[in-house]
Amino acid sequence: MSKKAWIVLLVAVGIVAVLLGATASAQNLEVVRLSEVVRSVFYAPQYVAIAKGFFEEQGLRVDLSTAWGADKGAAALISGAVDVGFFGPEATIYIYQQGAQDHLVGFAQLTERDGSFFMARDPAEEFSWENVRGKTIVGARIGGVPQMCLEWVLKQNGIQPFEDVEIITGLAFEAAVGAFEAGLGDYIAQFEPALSEIEARGRGKIVASIGAEAGPLTYTVYHARKSVLEKNPDLFLRFTRAIHQGQLWVYSHSAEEVAEVIAPFFPLIDLDILVKSMGLYQSIDAWPPTPVISEAHFLHLQEIMLEAGELEQVVPFQVLMDTTIAERVLEELK
């Protein structure tokens, strides 16, 4: 065999060895099936944790899917189709109140504000909530926290939902933006980056933040079935470590830097739109500094649910939210 042939053979063997090593390494990672409620820049710390390899550092590989609704995400978790469900705790409360034995438990929090911004099709020179009186808002699903927060904010500003203003609630989350852009409604409450895209096309203007108006609350949380959480706490501990690394990374980097990292999760969105969206969420303190769920914020969520008529009585924090794992993650950093 010629010297050149030997070199080619050695290179080929080296490539195969690297591929086999990578495959073996991947096989050593424990797969976590994660269902997120929607795809939004609002969940930037999660995407950073995936993109920067923080889960791999914990021996985990995330199989990420998007449910497009808290109800759908909760159903997937209950059925065992996923290991972790990322959605609003309102779904957990509803399931518990239906008498489920192996109910869902939240173990780590990612967001503590409503992620919706409020857009006007034809904005006044200066926005006031009085402007919406007699108009039509493209809202969200009845019973979901985005819709309940919108109603809360309207009431706090003297506007009675469905009486002083029409609210469209029958559209699927992913269809609402297209309907508004096609001419439906005078206003819309929606997550980023959808509204910044509309604004860039000159078809509306962001005039307010529902999250800033509604105040801090337990908004989007990682959940597991109670039995699974108790059976394998180490899995969820490692998962929470990775999420907290994502939180810390986002806190210590600019909107531009974060946007570049999460861009692969939004292949159809221009980078400048992602940067703007990140800046909007940073401006309202959308993310808590730790994954520990706040009892006071959970109570505020239930206050909003009670006001919306979606809850008859408050559920004790300790029943549905478990802070021990997130608290342990913080202890490890001391």
Which sequence ranges carry the predicted segments?
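Short, low-complexity disordered leader/linker segments with a strong preference
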Residues: 1-31, 331-334
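Short, glycine-/small- and polar/acidic-enriched structural segments
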Residues: 27-162, 166-172, 179, 186-192, ...
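Soluble non-cytosolic domains of exported or imported proteins
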Residues: 40, 67-71, 86, 144-145, ...
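Predominant activation on well-ordered alpha-helical scaffold segments within soluble catalytic domains
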Residues: 47, 93, 151, 196, ...
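Short polybasic/polar patches that bind polyanions
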Residues: 50-51, 56, 155, 199-200, ...
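Pocket-lining segment of extracytoplasmic ligand-binding domains
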Residues: 91, 122, 173-267
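Secondary-structure end/capping motifs
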Residues: 230-312
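Conserved C-terminal helix/tail region of periplasmic/extracytoplasmic solute-binding proteins
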Residues: 302-334
